From Swiss-Prot:
Keyword set, alphabetical order: Calcium channel impairing toxin, Disulfide bond, Ion channel impairing toxin, Neurotoxin, Potassium channel impairing toxin, Protease inhibitor, Secreted, Serine protease inhibitor, Signal, Toxin
Protein name: Kunitz-type serine protease inhibitor As-fr-19
Signal peptide (from-to): 1-17
Pfam families listed in its UniProt record: Kunitz_BPTI
Family: Belongs to the venom Kunitz-type family.
Gene3D superfamilies tied to this protein: Pancreatic trypsin inhibitor Kunitz domain
BPTI/Kunitz inhibitor domain residues: 21-71
Tissue: Expressed by the venom gland.
Disulfide bonds: 21-71, 30-54, 46-67
Amino acid sequence: MMLLVLSISAILQVSHSVSFCLLPIVPGPCTQYVIRYAFQPSISACRRFTFGGCEGNDNNFMTRRDCEHYCEELL
């Protein structure tokens, strides 16, 4: 029973830790236009996009390396 509880807990932690990687890529309405990276599930990779500087979400990384690090379980 304890093993089952630990297994379920581990699965929930993993899925919660990468859930932001599954959020849509949101450029935002502002016009700062900075290069950012986001995980794109349809291609299972991090891709570059232009972020406007406001109203984005947590699927928004300053570098490809950061994106790949945080979303590596989905690659």
